[in-house]
Amino acid sequence: MPGRVARVTEVIAGSPNNFQEAIKLAFDRANQTLRNITGMKIVDMSVMCEAGQIQEYRVRAEVIFVLE
């Protein structure tokens, strides 16, 4: 029975609107380059603030994909 080997790579993305958009941007960008993505784990969520206002929503994610 053959097994599978996966790899994990980290991506960071930001959005001025919300975390959901930042997550989608991270996934969409990873999906342009990586094949066989099987999952994505959000490792960290943070915001960048300036003058008492949120300027950017940021996510750090691990993208899991199966090696060919």
Locate each region found by the language model.
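Amphipathic alpha-helical hairpins
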Residues: 2-5, 9-11, 46, 52-55
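Short, well-ordered alpha-helical segments
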Residues: 3-39
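Charge-dense, low-complexity polyampholytic segments
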Residues: 35-49
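A cross-kingdom feature marking charged/low-complexity
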Residues: 45-68
